[in-house]
Design a protein with these regions (language model features):
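Short, Lys/Arg-rich, polar N-terminal cytosolic tail immediately upstream
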Residues: 1-13
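A structural signal for multi-pass alpha-helical bundles of membrane permease subunits
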Residues: 14-302
Length: 302
């Protein structure tokens, strides 16, 4: 036994010795590809620039412009509402479908494939497809998708739900199949009804899947860009009176599209767009951490 342990230690010793050599390339790539651009982005958020080389320090001016921008406030409100609606709708429907498909129904595998397929289509393609579908329906009523902010908002909700429900469904199916059979049998023997079994046995055991799906839908909702750009482009637009005077506000614009528009439309606001991106990162990080903490605290140990 001692001889075996000695041989193992002799094998592990050179591996530990050369571990930094194997880690170094990935670590350097991480620094060059993520850490350095991230730190540079934070610095540029305090500058006025057209290119990083001509950046001029302006302090907190960019952040003051962000908080006085009516378009950013509108995009934040839209994104918050969109995230709430999407999280509830996608997770409720995905869990319901997953629960139905784990009840030994015929053709379950076919249904899983069909529900998952929309997730394989790119967001821009989906945006243009659904734009044609919605406009084709609405023209019968003498209107179109971007004529009203309500149409655009709910059109985006439908598009994203249709795309993501299948993916979340797969995660919920994995969670439901991991529920211990002995717990279900014990609940049945104790005379628990279907709803009691669902809410007191199944859902507590599926909390890890709920945590994952809630995290994904939350972050996806806040990062939503390509579908928003392709479906409505943020339209329609209105002129509003803000803190900094009159400004054009895109009614269906979400945060990611607002940052993109700020950078590309107004060349003098590159630093402002960068400041928005930093605020956006902090916001998503805080919400994601808070959501993970809130849902993980409700998970049960297997």
């Amino acid at each position: 036994m001692a001889k075996v342990k000695k041989q193992v230690s002799l094998v592990q010793r050179p591996i530990k010795k050369f571990a930094p050599v194997f880690i170094l390339p990935t670590f350097l790539a991480f620094i060059i590809g993520f850490i350095w651009p991230f730190m540079q982005g934070i610095y540029l958020s305090f500058c006025n620039f057209n290119t990083p080389r001509d950046a001029k320090w302006v302090g907190f001016q960019n952040y003051l412009k962000v908080f006085s921008d009516a378009g950013f406030a509108n995009a934040f409100k839209n994104t918050a509402l969109f995230a709430i609606v999407s999280i509830i709708l996608i997770n409720v429907l995905a869990f319901t479908i997953a629960y139905a498909l784990t009840q030994r129904m015929r053709g379950a595998n076919l249904y899983r494939t069909v529900f998952f397929m929309p997730n394989l289509i790119g967001g821009v393609v989906l945006g243009y497809i659904w734009s044609m579908i919605f406009d084709g329906i609405l023209k019968n009523y003498g209107t179109y998708l971007t004529a009203n902010g309500t149409y655009g908002f709910w059109g985006l909700v439908i598009l994203v739900a249709w795309q993501q429900i299948g993916y979340m469904m797969i995660i919920y199916i994995a969670g439901l199949q991991a529920v211990p059979e002995d717990m279900l049998e014990a609940a049945k023997i104790d005379g628990a009804s279907g709803s009691q079994t669902l809410f007191q046995v199944i859902i507590p055991n599926v909390m890890p899947s709920i945590t994952t799906c809630t995290f994904l839908t939350l972050t996806n909702s806040f990062k939503m860009f390509d579908q928003n750009m392709a479906l409505t482009g943020g339209l329609p637009s209105v002129i509003v009176e803000g803190v900094a005077g009159k400004a054009k506000v895109n009614i269906t614009e979400l945060l990611a599209l607002n940052i993109y528009s700020t950078y590309n439309i107004n060349k003098n606001w590159h630093g402002v767009a960068q400041a928005k991106a930093v605020i956006f990162f902090i916001l998503v990080a805080v919400l994601a951490i808070a959501q993970q903490w809130a849902t993980r605290s409700k998970e049960v140990e297997q």
